[in-house]
Design a protein with these regions (language model features):
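Hydrophobic positions within repeat-based interaction scaffolds
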Residues: 6-9, 46, 250, 257-260, ...
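Amphipathic alpha-helical segments of tetratricopeptide repeats
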Residues: 13-17, 53-60, 93-100, 133-144, ...
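"A position-specific structural signal for the A-helix of alpha-solenoid helical repeats
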Residues: 27, 34, 67, 74, ...
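Membrane-proximal low-complexity regions enriched in glycine and acidic/polar residues
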Residues: 197, 201-299
């Protein structure tokens, strides 16, 4: 809530002042990074746009490049979510040019990743595909960016699916699997979220190509993942389509009603659900209900046309919920490391730090 955020920002301000007094630029950089992360968690994109440029200058001055790329990425994301694609593209180009001047392949790849996302939110699929392919090529040549590499593959699959390039998508699977294996080896643990992204791509590909038996295999894999963080809407929608293909209309109808519950705030997704439900009702011979639903779809289309950009972001949120989950886990780790650093070098802030630890513990719980 606002009170906790105010407390957190006060703590960051005190820590920044102490870091400056001690000449601890590493801690100062961490403060700025965690400030941006705090605003991300609250969807405060204007705050990110206001603060990030100054922080980026600090990172450049002190050559804290990994933090620079992470925070510049968040600035680009903020512009995208504000709908300012021109500014997002300008920032991505600036980020790429700086990385290229340093011959930093990881930085160049991160900039290409950000550029590809800007193309994605504008439905510029081919340009998105080209960016992600180059991003992936560069990331195979560096280490420490396996999470971004597997996410790039997930986005690339979405781009190929949007273009109907199903053969290319399936050809991508072996190297996608190798990327996940490399990620697991580097992390020392399994990566169910990364596998989940791959299974979603394959499940939806087989649904699109009407191979419902294959789609069912990947749906089962997704449902078998422990701590499954795949969108429940995505799973319910797939289950409804697969059950419909098998003629089990009663269960299909229950599944699609379950999907509708998950997307009440998105008229875009609700209409997609209604279209599937209308087809199921028609196959069941419940024509009056199907026609009523058809009228609802037509009426909703006018609303959707007026809020097309917002609807597009609702779709993105559904597609990339796994990525959000990964990012949240990384943010929690950043908070932990940051708090530990305060305990070690900032004894003057011990009381404030203890309170901050309690906040994070409650959040994690």
């Amino acid at each position: 809530d606002d009170r906790k955020m105010d407390t957190l920002l006060t703590l960051f301000g005190q820590t920044e002042a102490e870091a400056i007094r001690q000449g601890n630029v590493k801690m100062q950089g961490m403060v700025y990074g965690n400030t941006i992360i705090s605003h991300i968690n609250r969807n405060e994109y204007d705050k990110i746009i206001q603060k990030a440029p100054g922080y980026l200058d600090f990172y450049i001055l002190h050559e804290q490049w990994k933090l620079y790329y992470q925070i510049h990425m968040q600035l680009i994301t903020a512009y995208n979510l504000k709908g300012d694609y021109k500014k997002a593209a300008e920032e991505a180009k600036l980020m790429f040019d700086r990385a290229k001047a340093r011959k930093d392949k990881a930085g160049m790849a991160t900039a290409l990743y950000a550029t590809a996302i800007t193309y994605n939110v504008q439905d510029r699929w081919k340009e998105e595909e080209d960016c992600f392919r180059e991003c992936i090529r560069l990331l195979w040549e560096v280490s420490g960016y396996d999470n971004i590499l597997t996410q790039a593959y997930a986005f690339l699959c979405s781009s190929l699916r949007a273009q109907g390039q199903y053969d290319k998508l399936l050809q991508l699977v072996p190297e996608y699997e190798k990327a996940i294996a490399r990620f697991e080896k580097a992390a020392g643990r399994t990566q169910p979220e990364a596998w989940g992204n791959l299974y979603v791509a394959l499940m939806n590909t087989y649904i699109d190509t009407k191979d419902y038996d294959k789609a069912g295999e990947y749906l089962a894999k997704l449902e078998g993942i422990v701590n499954n963080n795949i969108s429940r809407y995505e799973l319910a929608r797939a289950k409804a389509l697969i059950l419909q293909s098998r003629g089990d209309y009663r269960k299909a109808l229950a599944a699609i009603d379950s999907a509708a519950v998950e997307v009440q705030e998105s008229e875009f997704d609700l209409n997609a659900v209604r279209k599937i439900k209308m087809e199921i009702l028609t196959r069941m011979g419940r024509f009056d209900e199907a026609f009523t639903l058809f009228d609802t779809i037509i009426a909703a289309n006018d609303t959707i046309k007026d809020v097309e950009i917002n609807a597009r972001f609702d779709e993105l949120r559904t597609q990339y919920e796994v990525e959000k989950h990964i990012a949240e886990k990384e943010r929690n780790l950043h908070y932990f490391l940051f708090t530990l650093g305060i305990c070690l070098v900032l004894a003057l802030l011990l009381t404030a730090t203890f309170y901050y630890n309690r906040i994070i513990a409650l959040k994690n719980h």
